[in-house]
Amino acid sequence: MKRNTFTRLAALALTLILALSLTACGGKDNTSADNNDSDTKATVKIGVPNDTTNEARALLLLQENGIIKLADGAGITATKNDIVENPHNVEIVEAEAAQLPNMLPDLDYAVINSNYAINAGLNPVSDSLLIEGSASAYANILTVKEGNETSPKALALKAALESKQVADYISQQYNGSVVSVVENPTDGYDASVDYDALKGQTITIAASPTPHAEILEVAKEILAAKDITLDIQSYNDYVVPNTVVDDGTVDANYFQHLPYLEDFNAQNGTHIVSISAVHVEPMGLYGGKQTTLDALSK
């Protein structure tokens, strides 16, 4: 009797040891109701701009559409480290904004600024899978070096960019991909400016090729009617257009939104100020390997 009891106890102990060993090695109880799908869900790679304000803007777009959740209080300086919920197993891939269209074949999706999307042959309205509203916080601005806000050249350029001609061009040319935010367009001229004194002079401005340099061509015609030359210098990056304003090489620039400018000034010690909000370019989510949002809805 005692021998049989001992045998049964030994068998029971062996069973418990085996069960504990399986658990320690990662064995799962198949009867558990809590099967974590995220362990087996495929990674979804989404490219975003790597500069502070545009990365935050991209992440906010993803959050607004239920793809991720950011920590409370994460706003226009949010980074991927602020992601607190990631139900679709998204991997955020940071890259220079201008390179994201070229990276689409290697990514599932990318969040791209409209100017770079348009330059790559994408239509922000018809080709994007998700798109921002016309958020005024990200309006693209005309800027000058601090102290030059009321110079005749700055005021003449400001009036030309805030003209009805420019607003109409934006509406007709971009069909919603770029939206004018000028509330009361002018006739292109500022009554306080002595245009006769500016005759024969040149205003230099740095801009990105699309759409900024294109829009400036309309302003160029307005200024030319007063015998003022607008010299448009195109740049493909986010740094040089600000440095050439700050060092006085050019009179103004037109390529960025205010949150980016504020961050740039803080990081680089520059003194560049906005004198006009001209248009907004809604940021969009574009498909790469994925052509629908199905990978983000499972």
Which role does the model predict for each range below?
Residues 74-102, 232-243:
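Short helix-initiation/N-cap motifs at beta->coil->alpha
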